[in-house]
Amino acid sequence: DFSAPQFRVDESDPNSPSTVFKANELRAVYSVTGAYPAMLGLDLSEIETGRECYSIQQAIEWHKAGGIVTLCWHWMAPTQTEGKRHFYTEKTDFNLKQALENPGSAEYQGLLHDIDLICAELQKLQEAGVPILWRPLHEASGGWFWWGASGPKAYQSLWSLMYDRMTNVHGLNNLIWVYNGQDPKWYVGDERCDIIGDDPYYTNGSRVAYYFDSANANRFKTCYK
């Protein structure tokens, strides 16, 4: 049996779960179905900029209640330019290809620094025995996030860097790696991911067509063997 945990809320803190997560959506689902969703999706965004992270404790509580946790990371680009730390390509000047080609650069070291910060948070989940569906660097082929703005080779190199650092340097073994690059040309390889996913979007088309796209996502070829 699963019962959604009651997350503590600090109404005086604008960055607390009161503005990020109040479980309102969960209660709405329960009010209609009489049951809570089994899976909770959380984001580690802005840990790398010094913002306090509530997602880790929420993940632990959700796991203790019998739920499944999936994490993504809207990574604020590690640029050295003031005011340009953002995950959207159009709002940052960070060049992934250049950073990867220059391991001694501040930009490359920024990549490692941010990954290490996230690893410290993920380590807390490993110590608590929480398995995570880890979905980093998502929707890369769309180009709207900086990690996809330099093309598939740079993206694959960044994925490999992250995978190696998290797995071999930090020893994280509680991560189930989810590839969500949206395009077979961007695939990171069977040895570096466990699950393949896709994000269909509803724009101005038919809602019925959107539903069938979502329901039949397993028919889309999103990777090559």
Report each predicted region and the residues it spans.
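N-terminal module-boundary/linker segments of secreted carbohydrate-active enzymes
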Residues: 1-43, 56-60
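Solvent-exposed loop/turn segments at secondary-structure junctions
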Residues: 2-4, 45-48, 75-78, 138-142, ...
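Surface-exposed substrate-engagement region within the catalytic domains
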Residues: 12-19, 26, 31, 165-225
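A conditional alpha-helix N-cap/helix-loop micro-motif detector
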Residues: 19-22, 52, 111-115, 213-216
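Flexible, charged surface loops at secondary-structure boundaries
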Residues: 31-36, 63-64, 126, 189-191
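Structural recognition of the beta-strand scaffold that forms the well-ordered cores
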Residues: 37-43, 68-73, 132-136, 176-179, ...
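Substrate-binding cleft of extracellular glycoside hydrolase catalytic domains
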Residues: 45-161, 165-168, 172
